[in-house]
């Protein structure tokens, strides 16, 4: 074993021992957090799952939602090596051809249209048929990636009951499965529109694009969400109505181990929303997650996913959430309560931080009361919300 690895292992054992001793010796949370350094929280949580005090402290210190580390075993590595020369190239070849097909169809659909006016009213006639065709082709794309069957639980509500679908946790580009499975229109960042293959497709299905850095763009997107949700500019005929708006309120990809602060855009109209959950088996080799702090990018993520013989994902449609008067007047409260309900259903905590705070801080550690701490300390304060603490009138 290399000296550096041995030193790191000794440090981990030492700090973990201090952490466990402090849990049983002191009642001061600040003292405990001060001594937390590189402690493997998840492992401790599993070992001492029945100890209430340890649960409380671990939930308080939390888990970094923006980091992901792939830890393949020997068998996983063997499968990846074999699939890299057999299964993955075949799958990627099929995916490439299907994406070319969707790009070609989208380009045909966008002929004789003004890019600035594509979102003024929903497409109808032959363009609507092409939109449906593209959704079917994308289902074939996901099949080629190994998603042979997608488990869908719950019932998707009608637009009259819930004009907006809010989905979490958002961990990977594969989450687009939920968009196409629901037949809705997504809200995406402006960068998606510039992607060569994907951009024209998302433009043709009339996605809403938002520039996060520009306040005017965000407000314009909110106005468009309100317009589409209420069909203010559409005809009364069902064939000329906008489909439901699909939003990932977290606004970025996380590792699915906690729900970060929801952006309020989806909740500003003050109308009912239907929460949608994406469930993945985090106990298996997680090749799907693509977040901020990991050692490989989206292309490697796609390659590793195609190396898996079969991938599983579950989409659950929860009951429609109707805001009360207080929530209609306060979008942040509305968003917080919906997030609490979704987190409770998923069995994961919520963290009172957003990706903008993480990136503005350069990805450094967060601490209680936003105070800077040593770079060695990884502290992510959580707030646990359960259904029992959620009141709705």
Language model feature labels by segment:
Residues 1-41:
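Intrinsically disordered, low-complexity basic segments at termini and long loops, enriched
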Residues 2, 28, 40-146, 372-374, ...:
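N-terminal membrane-anchoring alpha-helices
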Residues 103-149, 158-220:
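Catalytic core of membrane glycerolipid acyltransferases/transacylases, capturing the structured
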Residues 1-5, 10, 36, 44, ...:
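Cytosol/nucleoplasm-facing, intrinsically disordered, low-complexity tails
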Residues 225, 334-345:
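Short amphipathic C-terminal alpha-helix that caps PH/PH-like domains
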Residues 80, 91, 150-154, 159, ...:
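Eukaryotic intrinsically disordered and solvent-exposed regulatory patches
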Residues 196-204, 240-244, 251-333, 349-376:
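A cross-family acyltransferase "interaction/gating" segment
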Residues 94, 151, 165-167, 178-180, ...:
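Beta-strand cores of modular interaction/reader domains in eukaryotic scaffold and signaling proteins
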